[in-house]
């Protein structure tokens, strides 16, 4: 199978390696969609960490991936089902053709819809967990700093959880426009406006309940 591998700083090569075999409690997943986490962008554009060793493991760095089960040794999943899988640290990363997924690190997604959209459930799950730690959001004013993928997930979830006002803050106008589509009631561009003053005006002086 094909697998991507970071062989030296900022260099990714495609290698042909053996397709993995699976153990009990695992499924072999033919991966079809991948998403690049912000924490992985640095491998192409950011600093090189001194503790990193090359070549890195096959499939790294990628931990947001989804596909269809082609072989199963799990009582919980069957061939043909579509899943999101979270790669573990003791196996390959997600930039591979086939991945041996542990059933405890897999989640079913519906048969309908594009996997490229369903895969966003993976980072959004982190956001959902964070929102659960906040307690009730109902009727509160919530400020979301940044409207990248994680920020937009926060905007969408708190808007649907009953927040009174969802205030998106980002220096990029196109991201603020997406914030509105995802549920922001107000937007602030910190390059143009003083954030504290804008918040005070929006919230009648009380600022935010949650930020």
Residue ranges: model-predicted function:
Residues 4-12:
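Extracellular beta-rich ligand/substrate-recognition surface
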Residues 117-192, 197, 210:
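Mid-domain Rossmann-like dinucleotide-binding core that forms the NAD(H)/NADP(H) cofactor-binding site
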Residues 63-64, 83-145:
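NAD(P)H dinucleotide-binding glycine-rich loop of Rossmann-like/cofactor-binding domains
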Residues 39-45:
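Cytochrome P450 core scaffold surrounding the K-helix E-X-X-R motif
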Residues 2, 26-28, 141:
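Residues that mark the start of a beta-strand
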């Amino acid at each position: 199978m094909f697998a991507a591998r970071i062989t030296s700083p900022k260099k990714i090569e495609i290698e042909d390696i053996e397709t993995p075999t699976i153990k009990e409690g695992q499924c072999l997943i033919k991966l079809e969609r991948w998403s690049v986490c912000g924490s992985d962008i640095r491998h192409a554009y950011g600093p090189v960490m001194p503790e990193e060793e090359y070549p890195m493991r096959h499939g790294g760095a990628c931990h947001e991936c989804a596909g269809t089960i082609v072989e199963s040794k799990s009582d919980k999943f069957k061939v043909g089902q579509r899943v999101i899988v979270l790669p573990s640290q003791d196996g390959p990363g997600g930039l591979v053709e086939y991945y041996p997924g542990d059933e405890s690190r897999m989640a079913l997604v519906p048969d309908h819809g594009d996997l490229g959209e369903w895969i966003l459930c993976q980072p959004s799950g982190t956001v959902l967990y964070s929102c659960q730690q906040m307690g009730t959001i109902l009727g509160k004013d919530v400020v979301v700093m940044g409207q990248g993928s994680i920020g937009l997930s926060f905007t969408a979830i708190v808007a649907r959880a009953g927040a009174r006002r969802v205030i998106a803050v980002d220096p990029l106008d196109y991201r603020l426009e997406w914030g509105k589509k995802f549920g922001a009631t107000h937007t602030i561009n910190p390059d143009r406006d003083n954030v504290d003053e804008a918040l005070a005006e929006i919230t009648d002086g009380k600022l935010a309940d949650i930020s």
